[in-house]
């Protein structure tokens, strides 16, 4: 169903009962769930709840991704078996998902009999169809532990920016991708020994087969997100270009996973059996509920299948996975929905670096999970844009929207209705024009949710809440209650308020399911569905005593959350200041220290051994620092360092500035951003043109030891041309 189709969906209208299978990416079973993970599970859960409220047959499936070298080594470090480790982690993950209201129909494990059988079946079907190749490859080998090393188990010095302790496939500092053999001074993270090269027989899925390319070109054209389609087309290349490489689907013993049939000592690579785990989890559910599993996965199935994932695993879900399914005789996904990454107060989260806020720490500090569900939903849309958890904004938005605008409507009306009118609404009040407006908006809000435009759904809902509060403030029930002669008007006001509250609760139910349960109990009504928009409260059913549905965020709770994750967040700040690229070139100036996380950390820039000379305030006043908006940005042909920025500085014309930040940013990342520039720097004639100023960037003092480069961004509200003083 396209986005345009979704907007025509009418809440409660007969759409036909759809059969839908939905998955989120499988969390890896060697670590904790953090709030970055929760973006995806909350996004998926809201969509699933939306579809359940339409009455569709929908199943939300998940599992722990349990196989691979990291799990094997983690278990060894803990002195337990891999199976013991994954069983414990499963319980922890299930606890966290339950805490945040993630309503899986089945949360399973990829280390299951169902998954082994399905993985073998798919592999053998691909082999029979000629899609499996066998060849010798050379790999890194740990001579001490006598094991082949995955790329992420080799570290060394980045060949480009020379950052230390970088992984064997990509640099977390400058973003460069490379082969493990490109690392300078590589070492095994398992034993510390220098890896040697050794050959082994491996098995490959022939993604380069012309049949795969032809199928994938057609399949990716149907993806819902244009940016996903464009990225896949980049990887596919032009017709005849043959950019797709065969995919290594095997690993050597020792390895925790499923052994490949007919290949002793060889195991399925985790990325083969992990997506099959979606089907394995669903098969387990089907066996328990008596559902026809084959009817959902066979090639001619009329059911729908959607995968919600992070944009970092698009490659696996839009190339490997659909090709595996197509050529093993199964149905392919209806669509794949990718989301962006989460930052916390502007800093990128990194699980491998331990820089994340755990789900459990959020719960342990007494924060309401539905606050986070609401905040994430307010920022989510149907694109792959990154979202930021700004903790000050989080507190302000929850307190203003959920407490100030929403639950206070019920608290203001319920007392009068119970005390004066036996808890029963006025029947004639259910026809009030304000309620007609709310009922008319419900179908559009439901359509926004289905189109994954959660931010739009919540903005519309809060606009309606503003209208309801305006009505209450105008009617002044607290004044009406002072005079018995106003009883009819008071009854109408309270009745309209509570019916409006019911409708707002309906609009918010996919996001706030536990609050919705409380509302349903308070109003004495059945679980709300979209079809209930036109079924108002009845005088025959008195409301119950009002119980507080939600409290305000206490700043002390935020402080406790930061304290619980202080080491992690300081690591984020340190990583940001130890950053990415070398050499700033003309038009870019290093500043000292850049706030990168919610929790302050010792700045690398503050450790500068060579102190800058002291200047007077008059010296500083000579520098005209201005807010600038980057309206255009492009790479400079012939330069590996420079980007050409077109800046709006609030003047009648734009300015042209060359900045040496190409190693840290792609042009499209900068367009639309605000930054800070030196506006009164003398223009400089360069090889590539005239540079009319300088943008500011932060980096560490010793750029070779701690490379990194970060442009400065002002807070929202700053405008082009404003002076920085």
Swiss-Prot record:
Question: Which part of the chain is the tRNA-binding domain?
Answer: 619-725
Q: Where along the sequence does the record place the motif called 'KMSKS' region?
A: 348-352
Disulfide bond annotation, renumbered to this chain: none
Its recorded reaction(s) are: tRNA(Met) + L-methionine + ATP = L-methionyl-tRNA(Met) + AMP + diphosphate
Choose any GO biological process term that the UniProt entry carries and state it.
methionyl-tRNA aminoacylation
Enumerate the subcellular locations listed in this protein's record, separating them with semicolons: Cytoplasm
UniProt KW Cell membrane keyword: no
Give start-end ranges for motif 'HIGH' region.
Answer: 27-37
Give an example GO cellular component term for this record: cytosol
Q: How is the cofactor bound?
A: Binds 1 zinc ion per subunit.
Q: Which residues of the sequence carry a binding annotation for Zn(2+)? A: 158, 161, 171, 174
Gene Ontology MF term list: ATP binding; metal ion binding; methionine-tRNA ligase activity; tRNA binding
Q: What is its main location?
A: cytoplasm
What Enzyme Commission number does this protein have?
6.1.1.10
Q: Which Gene3D superfamilies match?
A: HUPs (3.40.50.620), Isoleucyl-tRNA Synthetase, Domain 1 (1.10.730.10), Methionyl-tRNA synthetase, Zn-domain (2.20.28.20), Nucleic acid-binding proteins (2.40.50.140)
What is the role of this chain?
Is required not only for elongation of protein synthesis but also for the initiation of all mRNA translation through initiator tRNA(fMet) aminoacylation.
Q: Which NCBIfam families match?
A: metG, metG_C_term, PRK00133.1
UniProt subunit comment: Homodimer.
Which family, according to UniProt? Belongs to the class-I aminoacyl-tRNA synthetase family. MetG type 1 subfamily.
User: HAMAP family, per this entry?
Assistant: Met_tRNA_synth_type1 (MF_00098)
- Protein's recorded name: Methionine--tRNA ligase
